Amino acid sequence: MQIDLMVDSASRPDLLQIAVESLKKNLKFSGKIRYMLHEAVLNEELSNQCLRYAESLCLFDIIHKERRPKGEMVSIGTILEKVEAPWFIHWEDDHELTRELDLDMCVDIFEKCPKVNQLTFNKRDTMTEVAGWVKKEVEYEGYKLTTSPHWRISPAIWRMSWIKPRWQSVQGNNGHWLMNDILQRVWRGHPENKTADSVIEVLGTFYLGPIGEPGYCVHMGTNRSGRV
């Protein structure tokens, strides 16, 4: 059993090291994790530091250097073409995994629950709503999950058979929302119809765990983005 994991890096060697070390420490999996690094060159010297660090670990099966980055969706699309496993984790360099994450449990959820296409690892205790959108706690095959209103780019594990044929490598730094606009076109012009139940049917996006589940990671990159 294999999971492919992309670390999305952008000229921030200090953050990259914290992120990678946290993954090595806290990811728990009985199978193989195939690590891949995408380095977007926003600063040549800092990116070279990132690459030297990655190469020193002998951890990454693939190290891709993008000299002219066109946005995060394009970066992800480049790596998706190299994914071999049925499950894919996208992890940004500015997220630190702060507690153990059982990937065997995630795979079991995917295998037993065909409606689940994405599991997001929350950055804070899972709340009952987000921006006025009311979440729903569900239980499938003994696992408690909470609906998520969007396709989350990071940090999350994806069902490749669902997302790969739908993926659009939208250019620009608002590509996440453009991508979601494509995936959520059924609600375009009718946002009132976007309920937790309809998200389950259309997207299959969930937070791992019930309402109140403690956060799995912290975001370190506030005001540290070099993207323009």
Task: Report residues per predicted region.
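Conserved donor-nucleotide/metal-binding helix-loop-beta segment in metal-dependent transferases, i.e.
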Residues: 100-122
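Short beta-strand/loop segment that forms part of the nucleotide-sugar
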Residues: 31-44, 64-65
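N-proximal low-complexity "stem/linker" segments adjacent to membrane-targeting elements
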Residues: 1-21
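Short, acidic, metal-binding catalytic loop of nucleotide-sugar glycosyltransferases
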Residues: 21-32
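Active-site nucleotide-sugar/metal-binding loop of Leloir-type enzymes
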Residues: 77-87
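Short beta-strand-to-loop acidic/aromatic patch adjacent to the donor-nucleotide binding site
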Residues: 86-96
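Short beta-strand-to-loop element that shapes/binds the nucleotide-sugar donor at the catalytic cleft/hinge
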Residues: 117-133
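C-terminal catalytic/acceptor-binding lobe
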Residues: 18, 151, 155-161, 165-228
